[in-house]
């Protein structure tokens, strides 16, 4: 079983992430993690923090000379701004006199609509939103991307599975039907909004610029694709073992994500059955190989991968920190007020794609090891190849 945890706050000294259950023999370095974290900082519409934020990565355990050892892999992502926040976010008690006059130490009592601020203050009994927003911040996703690097390496090296993402909508601008799905991350990452269609990308950039001029924010939709999945990852026997349920749960756990659909998703609900499913046809005369005429299901049927590309879309809401804040209540006085304005992005949809890749990869790695087992990459690859050879229908 692959398990993962993260710890740390947005302006704390570091984020810490641990993943357990990966086999020995995965080739991975701290440079690989740094490269994935750099991808997370990509995208037109990111805030000022991206211009100076640097993710200092250190592998603390589970890897030796660029190869995993089979034990828990632990990573720390240090906060290069920590000296500015050391007194405000100190884990140990601080003399109030040392905080006096420090602007960033002032209580945050005007919760933002759309953020975790108010519900978190109510749940944990805080009179200040700072403890809530520090952990609820999307900065935490840097730790998940770090762990996803290991999962993506396993999928690629043991099973030949590649996980990529691309942006299909920002605000009201969408990629038109019929545009082929990308197969290369390099081409997607070279685009300013990580869109595979150049004409749509230009319109997306313009949409972001208009929102920025209006002191507003934008959400959008990301599509995640996993190429090379074999049939049979996941199971139909219990709801919590269904691969789509597992993936959807992790994707919905990403900050600001409000919806998930597999394949044609909600569009399928408006079709008749005769036009909603993927017909099965022979892949070649005289063989027992099969293929699908379409991939409307997104590579999942009955909670299991079908062997077609896995395709899942994720809806991200507009960021709730606005430079022209919405109305709220100052909880220290009970009076009407405007929400706090924390430094943030106009649009973080391109970056969200990198986070969704990480979470899909972690779930697929868990499902693949559940199916094929193995304490090393070599062993699980042998088991996987044996499974493919044993398939009566392929």
Curated annotation (Swiss-Prot):
The record ties this protein, via Gene3D superfamilies, to: Chorismate synthase AroC
Q: What domain of life is recorded for the organism? A: Bacteria
Positions binding FMN in this chain are: 135-137, 255-256, 302, 317-321, 343
Pathway listed for it is: Metabolic intermediate biosynthesis; chorismate biosynthesis; chorismate from D-erythrose 4-phosphate and phosphoenolpyruvate: step 7/7
Q: Which UniProt keywords apply?
A: Amino-acid biosynthesis, Aromatic amino acid biosynthesis, FAD, Flavoprotein, FMN, Lyase, NADP
Name the enzyme group at the top EC level: lyase
Catalytic activity line of the entry? 5-O-(1-carboxyvinyl)-3-phosphoshikimate = chorismate + phosphate
Pfam families from the entry?
A: Chorismate_synt (PF01264)
Give the region (Disordered) as residue ranges.
270-291
The EC number(s) given in the record are: 4.2.3.5
Has UniProt tagged this entry with the keyword Electron transport? no
Q: How is the cofactor bound?
A: Reduced FMN (FMNH(2)).
Q: Where does NADP(+) bind?
A: 40, 46
Q: Which GO terms describe its biological process?
A: amino acid biosynthetic process; aromatic amino acid family biosynthetic process; chorismate biosynthetic process
Q: Which molecular function GO terms apply here?
A: chorismate synthase activity; FMN binding
The Swiss-Prot or TrEMBL record lists the needed cofactor(s) as: FMNH2
Q: What protein family is recorded?
A: Belongs to the chorismate synthase family.
Subunit structure, as described in the record: Homotetramer.
Which PANTHER family does the record cross-reference, listed alphabetically? Answer: CHORISMATE SYNTHASE (PTHR21085:SF0)
Q: What does this protein do?
A: This reaction introduces a second double bond into the aromatic ring system.
By what name is this protein known? Chorismate synthase
The protein's organism comes out as: Frankia casuarinae (strain DSM 45818 / CECT 9043 / HFP020203 / CcI3)
């Amino acid at each position: 079983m692959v398990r993962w945890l993260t710890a740390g706050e947005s302006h704390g000294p570091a984020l810490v992430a641990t993943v357990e259950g990966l086999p020995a023999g995965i080739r991975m370095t701290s440079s690989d993690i740094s490269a994935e974290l750099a991808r997370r900082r990509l995208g037109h519409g990111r805030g000022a923090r991206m211009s100076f934020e640097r993710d200092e990565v250190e592998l603390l355990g589970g890897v030796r000379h660029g190869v995993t050892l089979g034990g828990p892999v632990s990573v720390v992502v240090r906060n290069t701004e920590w000296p500015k926040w050391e007194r405000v976010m100190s884990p140990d008690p601080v003399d109030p006199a040392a905080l006096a006059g420090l602007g960033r130490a002032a209580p945050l009592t005007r919760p933002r609509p759309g953020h975790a601020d108010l519900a978190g203050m109510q749940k944990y009994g805080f009179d200040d939103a700072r403890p809530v927003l520090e952990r609820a911040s999307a900065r935490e996703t840097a730790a998940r991307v770090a762990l996803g690097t290991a999962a993506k390496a396993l999928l690629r090296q043991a099973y030949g599975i590649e996980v990529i993402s691309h942006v299909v909508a920002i605000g009201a601008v969408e990629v038109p039907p019929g545009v082929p799905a990308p197969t290369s991350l390099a081409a997607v990452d070279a685009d300013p909004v990580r869109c595979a269609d150049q004409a749509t990308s230009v319109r997306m950039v313009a949409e972001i610029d208009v929102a920025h001029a209006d002191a507003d924010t934008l959400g959008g939709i990301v599509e995640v694709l996993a190429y090379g999945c074999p049939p049979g990852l996941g199971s139909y026997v219990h709801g919590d073992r269904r691969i789509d349920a597992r993936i959807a749960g992790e994707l919905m756990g990403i900050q600001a994500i409000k919806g998930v659909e597999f394949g044609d998703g909600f569009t399928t609900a408006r079709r008749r059955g005769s036009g909603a499913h993927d017909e099965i046809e022979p892949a070649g005369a005289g063989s027992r190989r099969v293929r699908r005429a379409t991939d409307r299901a997104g590579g999942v049927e009955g909670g299991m991968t079908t062997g077609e590309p896995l395709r899942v879309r994720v809806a991200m809401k507009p960021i709730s920190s606005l430079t022209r804040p919405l109305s709220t209540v100052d909880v220290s006085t009970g009076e009407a007020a405007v929400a706090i304005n924390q430094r943030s992005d106009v649009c973080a949809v391109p970056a969200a794609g990198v986070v969704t890749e990480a979470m899909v990869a972690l779930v697929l790695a868990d499902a693949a090891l559940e199916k094929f087992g193995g304490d090393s990459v070599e062993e699980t690859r042998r088991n996987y190849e044996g499974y493919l050879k044993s398939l009566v229908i392929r």
